[in-house]
Amino acid sequence: MSRHTYSRRQLLQTLAAAGGVGLTACATRDRIGPADRARFLAPLRARPDRIFDITVCLRPFRAAGPRLDTERIRDTLVVHNYGHGGSGWSLSWGSSTIAVSKALAQSPDRIAVVGCGVLGMTSALLAQAAGKPVTIYTREVMQHSMSMRASGSFTPDSRIALTDAVSPEFPALWEQMTRTSLKNFRGHLGLPGDPVRWIDRYYVSDLPAQSALPPAEGELQFASYGSRLQDIFPDGEVLRPADTPFRAASVRRRGVLRFNIASYSQMLMTQFQIAGGRIEHREFHEPQEMAGLPEKVVINCTGYGARALWRDESVVPVRGQIAYLIPQAEFDYALAYRDVNVIPRSDGIVVQAVSGGDMRGYNDDSLVPDRQESDAAVQTLAKLYGQFRAPG
């Protein structure tokens, strides 16, 4: 097997053709890829009739990046922690560390968290770790929050900001949040239920590896910071297609982090409750209502809900839809092929159409599932796996 080298631009174009997302700027060194594991990949049973659920989420995108400032409502300090685009799970611990540090600076005797998605839950757990009693005020518990509709991929720069709208300090802040989150994820590896796990991801393309794709016109320039993490993530490997089961012109492989959303969220909820945390069901209609809480320091983790609650029109919805195929225990790798992403999880195999890149779903607030979209994505995969073979 020969070693291939690519320019950064060629690499990104190749990944885009395969449907790769997340850490898109992280140009990896290409290595000779041992094909032993690729020889024993299980095929996906890609049939539309195996879809048992379809969910839609609205990612809370802000051009300037997440909102992490503070404001006072009468005698109450509100610390904001929302607007993470498609990076909420990935940046959760790092962003919440910043928010909680601002909350603790007021030396409160107790802390309130509004919102019970992944940002709310990690904020609550970090405040508890600092010795503070915490009450989460929420309309929905975590298992029914928008966070549960995420794909489960580690994508810390997915729709995190626009390149020309962030402050000069933001790239370093993003790196700080990402590295802090990664240190926390490390502590969740190997736990029962595999809440966080390293898996292989295969980027399969019908185009030769060095094929260039013309840039799309009229696209927003979403920030991409993966190159700042080259010391952490494993090199990508170029595999000979003949050494893999895929009949394709180009096959690449790299290690990626995957979240088992169901088991991970249950673990976070359990930890919060064991530590004495309280959850109170409450819906806020005006920010001023937070001043009526007994806690005088509040961390606001309302996600896309902040657009209406805080009248923050800088929050733009980015619609995302995923279909769930019936789980296959033997299918344990992720895949990107023809603008379709596949992520194996214990609660279902996630299939997501990603054509259009980061602009897909931009400013679309529809929560209505599109069955045709999911069927088409699965049928695309069926064509790939219909030619699945034992490597020669």
Predicted regions and their residues:
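Flavin (FAD/FMN) cofactor-binding and adjacent substrate-gating region
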Residues: 14, 18, 54-75, 147-149, ...
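Glycine-rich active-site loop/strand segments that organize a redox cofactor
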Residues: 140-177, 235-236
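Short beta-strand to alpha-helix junction loop
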Residues: 87-91, 170-177, 252-267, 368-372
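Short hydrophobic core segments
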Residues: 296-302
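A conserved short coil-to-beta-strand element within the FAD-binding core of flavoproteins
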Residues: 278-292
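Active-site substrate-recognition segment that forms the wall
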Residues: 30-74, 83, 89-97, 117-130, ...
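N-terminal secretory signal peptides and thylakoid transit peptides that target proteins
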Residues: 1-19
